[in-house]
Amino acid sequence: MYNPIGSAEAREPAELPAAVAAELERLEGRLRQLAGAEARRHLAVLGEAGAARVLRAVAESRRVRTLPGFIKYLAKREAAITRRDARGVPTALSAPAFISGPSREEESVYTQLFDNEVQMYDQSPSNEMATSLSNHGMVEVGSPNQQMPFHLHGNGGSVRQIARLVPQLAQLTVESPCGHTSSVSQNQGCIEVGTPTQAMVSPGLNQMALPCRCMPSGLQNYIEIDSPIQPMISTPRRVSTPSSVQDISRLIENMAGPSVSPPSPITAMPQNPTTTCHTTDNALREAASPQMLALEELGFRKIFMVFAYLASEKIENVLSVDYIRSLKFLSMAQFESQIWRTFGHKYIAASDRAKNLDSDPGMTKVYHCNVAIRGDTVVKIFKGPYIENTRTHLQKVVGDDNVLVVKFMGKLSDTKTDFSTYCEHYHKVAEDGIVLGLRRYRFFVYKDGGKEEKLKQEKIEDKNKCTSPVMCYFVRTESGWNMDEPYILSGRTVGQARELFMHISSAPTLAKYMARFALILSKTITWDADLSAVYVRRIKDEPCMDRHGNVVHKDQEPLIHTDGTGLVSVDLALNCPTSIFKGKFLKPQPLLMQFRLFYNGSAVKGTVLVDRRLPPATILIRPSMVKIETHPELSGVRSVNSSEIVSARNAKKSLSGVQSVNSFEIVSTSNRPRRTLTSRFLITLLCYGGVPEEYFLELLQSAIEGAENACYDYEDALRIAFSYADMEDSMSARMILSGIPLEESYLQHRLDFMAQQERKGIKQGKIPIDECYYLMDTTDPTGTLRPNEVCVILENGQFSGDVLVYKHPGLHFGDIHVLKATYIRDLEKEYVGYAKYAILFPISGPRSLADEMANSDFDGDIYWVSKNPKLLEHFKPSEPWVQAIKPKKTKQKKPQDCNESKLERLLFHEFLKTRFTPSFALGTAADSWLAYMDRLLTDSLDEIEKKLIEEKMLKLVDLYYLALDAPKTGNKVNIPSDLMVKQYPHFMGRSFSYHSSSILGQIYDKAEDVESLRSCNVQPIGVSLLPCFMEREAPPAARHLWQHRYEEYLTDSTMLYRAMVDKEERNMKFQELYEKYKHMLYDASEFEQTQRDPDDVFSEACVIYQIVYEKARWSNDASRCGFAWKVAGRALCHFYALKNEGDTALCSLPLLR
């Protein structure tokens, strides 16, 4: 058996008698400590009886700080007593010393046990007095008026403990008070009880007749009793003690001598025995195997890894209890290596091995489970945990390990799988939950991939693919492990658990129920503010009004200007994290924050704008921002901040009284605009509005030249490196800025790759364009802007002049507006301060500008804003969009109409429908619209045909916008066949196509020609070594270590490339692989956080460079150099800058962009 600690001798623990081993195992489980090999050897030396007395003393102790030390202490005292007994020293003199235990109070045993003779009295109904020798106890065995005294030797244990000390059961006949006899066969697995007269002794004793009122003093160490409650008692091989035996034991213990509570005689079993249980009382634990119970000592991350490596194998068939316990004290890296060698390699691919084992404890750990149908069964494969830098609100409240991201896989087959097949198999999974060890996870929430992911999904022709952007989340609701308590969801149904986040039961429809509840899945940063001290107040929405001052209505609902916008006081804004982009903090302080507010059961979504007029600690929200209202009957429940939940969970404090969790979660903030690109929709709308094609061809030529020059020109190289910075941690930009020449092999390889990506984007109409910006939206706090005016705040403050404004993915001819950017006096001084980058819309006029553009609002959407003079010169706007097609009103199911079990089934069924029968209306409408637009821009159409096409396009626009909102409204959207095109332009890459000469067709052809020309003349990038890194020497031990690690990486990466996993999962695993080796190099997440000596880090980084590049030079393939830069890149850049440039300056990469 593998043991990571101790000497060679300690790695072979002493063998204990089965009963002693079983009792020790029980104590280890109860105390959550391992005794260790040395303590076991001490017990083995004592013999069975002495070891039993020691373990009883441990069990009687109120607190045990260190189990191994306590056992060794008691074992030495027991051995001393035994030696004194052998010399004839009275045991009464030694007993108090033995039982006193260590001097520390928490490890003291307060129960004194006396070896001298003490008479215990039990008044029987016949008024007879029963007497026995020292420390005897009496238990009724046959008749209510007759007792049998049981002699408990010296400091011997209670029946609860002593009942386990019978390794083998000898044949024994005992005379009962009524004259009956009973026998028990030797070595039987279970002992039948219930007969009035049964007692068992060790094989070492002879069979004997026993008087009904006394037991010979020789019957001292081995004893079992019968229970009038349970029909069967397991043999000593069983780990846990039957509850009825525990009850008898507890009562007998009170007779053993003076203790914490005074002794009392026993005349009968209590009517309702109370079981003192140290474990969670549920079905999972009751049916648990010893292996499942032993897992608790490992901690959840190790437990998860065990089940991930077992795949679908049963733990009982693979692992022993001793082996599981031997893993407890291993580091994560040692643990992973051990279980991989022992069993993991048999059941999972090497590419599925856990990576990044020593990650920062503060990083998010995402646990995955893939559920798939194989034949007639459903299998569950656990994967991860994967490391991320942001958390959802759900993960923060319940904890990372209590959330499972579950992927329900489609069947791989040539024929389409019927939806009923998925329902038949997967509904059962939702009903039973997903069991992981002694934990049960149940369906909680799901979320589709959003607009972009929907469009991507619909581009894939294979409708029966295995993966999906629809994400399903299960949460842990039950556990049989003590380590899992206290837990905030304990004792709650799934419905009650959801109410912690928001009073979702008040959702008006079933469709809105899950769409609103999915707000807890946004990746957010928690605003560290005490919401109990914050004044959250509602203010009215600003209505749209006509020229006569009347409120404008649509479908009997008033139109509003301020849909999704709120305000926040300056002091709270200053406490907000600095600007956020993709979970990373940027500077300076933001002007706008997109957020989710969970407050006293309500759920609020939108943006807040800094407003200096507000008193401190104030947040103003509007009715349009409130997605779920506080339930009137639950408005007075106890609410706590989410930060308090985290603190209480870490401190293992009870969370059972919490009824609602308050939290202000920041999704994103207004940031400096990044490089702006066009899109196919935007180009066609601009051309339709009069912008000449030649202008876009000029932009195209400039973009192609920039991509071509990226490998040779520093300016173009830095521009393209920053454009793709998120792809590789800005490593190419770091290399360039540190002075590494563009000719460096790996840098050339990366620049060439980014240029290829640039050309692919160009083919799709993604062309860089100057003087255009993407800005977050809100409304004018001053109320001074007119209906056609906006306020645009850029780098240098407010901009004045005409601008084009568009909201992606708008398709209507009038979705691009020409507006006047207007200066608002004293805006910075009296209202928003001097933060930047936003567009403010007016709150005047008969209709909101956001509603006119793609049916939008102001809850954090990003708008395209252009002050490009060429576009402004030629573009002529069209009339704004007005909805013509109204959605068909369908009867919506309400959550309030269902009981909880029916509601859960309906919600999961909706998930299955979203997952396996998705609507393709969105993609169909967009593709048909683009094909019609292509005809408008190329063909010489007469007015009648042009008008007919435009009418079809307007209908498609309405259906497209309806399909965007379908998940929230619950409306079904179908595209009529007469609106679908039969042929598509060639640049769309569809099967039935024609060659288009439109601007999009020309852009595609030009980029395609360049790509073809390059592929014919491509030259492989050779591998050359920079002397700066080759001259640095490192100790041979370091070189040997990293040589080994690199070979290990090559093996793992090869497996990853061969693994049958989707691209997202493969990228995630590669990232974890690199993080693992970075941590080995830096002892931290990054070079900037390392506590190691910089010289040592530089030496090892150069060794990594040398090993990797020398191997890559053999194949002359620069793509094989990536490991050096992905692992040691930051250290190498720093070293190069110091070595070659001398003086350096600290610079902000976002600022350089």
Curated annotation (Swiss-Prot):
Family matches, as InterPro entries: RNA-dep_RNA_pol_euk-typ
GO MF assignments: RNA binding; RNA-directed RNA polymerase activity
Disulfide bonding pattern of the chain: none
Tissue spec. comment: Expressed in shoot apical meristem (SAM) and panicles.
EC number: 2.7.7.48
Similarity annotation: Belongs to the RdRP family.
Entry function: Probably involved in the RNA silencing pathway and required for the generation of small interfering RNAs (siRNAs).
Protein name, per record: Probable RNA-dependent RNA polymerase 3
